[in-house]
C-alpha cells in the first residue's frame, strides 16, 4: 500500500496534462492507467461476488471480506483516477458499466469470473507491487 502511494506521488507530475518526454515517464503513465483499470475490474468483481454470496445466503464473514475488498479497490480506483485527471462523473459511469457487465456474466457463470479475476484481484489488494511490476514489464515491452 505504501509503495502504491509512493508511486502515485512520484508519478503525479507526469499526469495526463504533463508532456511525456522520456520512456520512463510514458511507462509510468501506462502503469497508472492500467492499475486504475485493474481497480475498476476488481471492484466490480468484489461487488458482484458479495451480491452473489448474499443471494445464496453464504458465509457472512466471506461477504464482509468481499465488501471490504470492494471498498478498498473503489477507493484506489478513484485515487488513481484523480491522478489521471479523470472526472468523478466519468469514473462513476465506467465503474457502473463494469459492474453491470460483471453482473450479467455472474448470472450465468460466476465460477468463470472467480477463475478469471479472483487470484489477480486478491493479489492486487494484498500486494500492489506485483501488479505494478507486471504493468511495468508490459509497458517496457510496448513503449520504445
PLM feature spans:
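Sec-dependent N-terminal signal peptides
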Residues: 3-14
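Repeat-mediated protein-protein interaction surfaces in helical alpha-solenoids
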Residues: 20-27
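Compact alpha-helical subdomains of small soluble proteins
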Residues: 65-144
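Generic short alpha-helical hydrophobic face used as a protein-protein interaction/packing hotspot
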Residues: 13, 46-47, 125
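Transition segments tied to proteolytic processing and entry into folded domains
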Residues: 29-30, 126
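Sec/Tat signal peptide C-region and signal peptidase I cleavage site
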Residues: 14-20
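Short N-proximal segments of mature Sec-exported proteins
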Residues: 30-85
Amino acid at each position: 500500500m505504501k509503495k502504491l502511494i509512493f508511486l502515485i506521488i512520484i508519478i503525479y507530475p507526469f499526469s495526463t496534462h504533463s508532456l511525456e518526454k522520456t520512456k520512463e515517464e510514458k511507462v509510468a503513465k501506462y502503469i497508472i492507467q492500467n492499475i486504475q483499470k485493474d481497480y475498476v475490474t476488481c471492484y466490480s468483481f468484489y461487488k458482484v461476488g458479495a451480491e452473489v454470496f448474499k443471494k445464496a445466503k453464504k458465509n457472512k464473514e466471506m461477504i464482509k471480506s468481499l465488501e471490504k475488498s470492494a471498498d478498498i479497490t473503489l477507493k484506489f480506483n478513484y485515487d488513481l483516477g484523480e491522478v489521471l485527471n479523470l472526472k468523478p462523473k466519468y469514473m462513476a459511469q465506467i465503474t457502473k458499466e463494469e459492474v453491470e457487465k460483471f453482473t450479467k456474466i455472474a448470472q450465468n457463470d460466476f465460477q468463470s469470473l472467480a477463475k478469471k479475476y479472483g487470484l489477480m484481484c486478491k493479489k492486487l489488494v494484498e500486494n500492489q507491487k506485483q501488479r505494478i511490476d507486471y504493468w511495468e514489464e508490459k509497458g517496457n515491452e510496448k513503449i520504445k
